[in-house]
Amino acid sequence: MQIGLYHYFTARGPIDLVISGPNYGRNTTAVFSLSSGTIGGAMEAAVCGVKSIALSYAFFDRNHDAAIIAGASELSARLIQHLHDGWGEGVQLYSVNVPLVESVGEKKILWTDVLQNKWSSGSCFQVVDVPDDESSDAVADEAQIRRQEASGKMGKEDGEGGQKHMRYTHKEFKWAPLFKDVYESVAQSKPGNDGWAVAQGSTSVTPLRANFMHVAGFQGEIKLGGEKKGALQES
């Protein structure tokens, strides 16, 4: 991001807005947003003092209809212009999630907050047994994950449990996220968050600041009670 801001396009004059995306896949709720390179790029622009918008397209199936994508892009262009022209006070970046649904331009655009959720069913990675003379097919694995994301399926079945401990140092892993955790957290949430809005077919706009906001109510000096002990103790 900084290379683009400071080392390219200088002949065009100062950059007044950075658009990161569109990412083909939603960046809603905490678990997706915190690992999003799309939002990360917009945050990097924001900490450089440039207004920025992270744009993501939320798909629901693998039917990538060109007309639906075109409709989402047309809406995105209008929405970006609207946000740019009336930039909110205190906002450093916006996270925009546009659902890939028919007639999205006729559906609601909602202000939202980020749904606080978590991975609750265990690891999003699985150990895979790969013979020494073979390697995993990353392209095929990515395609399978995308199919699971579209269908809302988990990476592994309930009750399957984790892998047994293997007595060797080298392990290979594949990403097998438990999308059910995300979809259930959205279904159980109250209206008003980004995941809920997209699930309703509405476009979500979340105003953000480029920081990890502290929790209010903690102030002053921290005093440790009890006797001083060594940093390390033998058990």
What would you call each of these model-derived segments?
Residues A42-G71:
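Glycine-rich phosphate/pyrophosphate-binding loops
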Residues A72-L79:
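Glycine- and Gly-Pro-enriched alpha-helical subdomains that act as flexible
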Residues Q2-A11, M43-E44:
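Acidic, metal/ion-coordinating pockets
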Residues N27-S36:
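Glycine/threonine-rich flexible loop motifs
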Residues A66, L83-S235:
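C-terminal accessory domains and tails appended to enzymatic cores
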